[in-house]
Amino acid sequence: MSTFIGQLIGFAVIVFIIMKWVAPLVKSMMQKQQEAIRAALEESAEASKKLAEADAMHTKAVEDAKSEGQKVTDEARQDSERITAQLAEQADTEAERIKSQGAQQVQLMRQQLIRQLRSGLGAESVEKAEEIVRNYVSDPAAQASTVDRFLEELNAMAPSPAVLEAGATLNLRAASREALAELVKKFESVADGADSDTLTTVADELSGVAKVLLSETTLNKHLAEPTDDSTAKTRLVERLFDGKLGSNSLELLKTATAQRWSSEGNLIDALEHVARLALLARAERDGQSEEVEDQLFRFGRLLDSQSQLSRLLADTTVPTDKRVELLKKVVDSAGEVNGTVAALLTQTVELLRGEPADAAVSDLAELAVARRGEAVAEVTAAADLSEEQRTRLTEILSRIYGTPVSVQLDVDPDVLGGLLITVGDEVIDGSISSRLAAARTGLPD
């Protein structure tokens, strides 16, 4: 019995120990294990849910991929069809362009070939024609016949509407033209009955005054300034030039300064013009007008052919005395030169103010002819004209221009035949050389 009780107590102690310490520990461990299992189950459920969602998303992604792939395929097919159509259209357009360019190129090559053939044949034709013409005009009689034919053509021309002017009036405005006319009128009254020495004095003195005004620009400005009352300018002229100029020159200078000039330089132009008229009037008194006219034209043609000489004579950077010295050397080398011509040329060179020397001498020659009431016709021919041809040409030109015409002939074999005529600003070109040149110019490039 005691054994049983001892065992029962031992069992009770064991149960107490188990319940006191072991059971809570086991219970805690079991709860933890249950929590772990529960968490594992929840995680498993969540994982299953996520897996299901992933499967759904995968399925949807696959469907979307299929749909997008189909869309891309459709778009690619459409792009392919569009590109194919565009390439076909571009190919057609390019083919048409190439075809058109090819046709244009063929046409261009055809035209170039035709032009080359025409140019070659045309040049050969012109050269052959020139050879034939040169052979023809080598005969003086045949060359003269070309002049006669041109005179027949010229005879049929209508009268020219050109107004021929010469000398200083060419570059003047209306006011200065009227002023110059008054001054020339005064000169004519002074020159009427004057002898050669008086005219020479007037020419020298007026030329000297012009040179003074060129160097004294302030004085020139004052004397040329337009005023309603010229009394002050007249008194100034008397105070400066009385006793230094002859009575005729002084009266002419007073008349000049009393006029209204368009510009200051026109007063000098007018004095130079009247000084020239005085020398030309002297030539008339001495019966040398035609000789003076002829020598002036010859010197003008010399300057035309010697451009360097013309530039040297007109170079205002060179002192005037040096240019006059050069002129005298040229005049002396030309042989016997009329004294009036030498004086006119010297006066012209001394008063050059920027214009070319050849143009100034040409104006001087035209003034010499205009002084005799004639127009000047500068005629270029391949050979000298016969007296009959010269007379007929003079008659025809006088009838065309309605005024007596003086013919100045220049012989140039390069003209070949016919005539080249210049009257004032009008040119009548009937030379064979110009016709050949026109034919050569008209050839295609």
From Swiss-Prot:
Q: Which UniProt keywords apply?
A: ATP synthesis, Cell membrane, CF(0), Hydrogen ion transport, Ion transport, Membrane, Multifunctional enzyme, Transmembrane, Transmembrane helix, Transport
Q: Which stretches of sequence are listed as region Disordered? A: 50-79
InterPro entries per record: ATP_synth_B-like_membr_sf, ATP_synth_b/b'su_bac/chlpt, ATP_synth_OSCP/delta_N_sf, ATPase_OSCP/dsu
Region named ATP synthase subunit b: 1-168
The residues the entry assigns to the signal sequence are: none
Q: Where in the cell is it found?
A: Cell membrane
One Gene Ontology CC term in the entry: plasma membrane
Primary residence: membrane
Give the start-end ranges of region ATP synthase subunit delta.
Answer: 169-445
A GO molecular function annotation here is: proton-transporting ATP synthase activity, rotational mechanism
The record lists the membrane-crossing segments as 4-24
Q: Which HAMAP family match?
A: ATP_synth_b_bprime, ATP_synth_delta_bact
Concerning its family, UniProt says: In the N-terminal section; belongs to the ATPase B chain family.
What assembly does the database describe for this protein? F-type ATPases have 2 components, F(1) - the catalytic core - and F(0) - the membrane proton channel. F(1) has five subunits: alpha(3), beta(3), gamma(1), delta(1), epsilon(1). F(0) has three main subunits: a(1), b(2) and c(10-14). The alpha and beta chains form an alternating ring which encloses part of the gamma chain. F(1) is attached to F(0) by a central stalk formed by the gamma and epsilon chains, while a peripheral stalk is formed by the delta and b chains.
Q: Which NCBIfam families match?
A: ATP_synt_delta, PRK13428.1, PRK13430.1
**What name does this protein carry?**
ATP synthase subunit b-delta
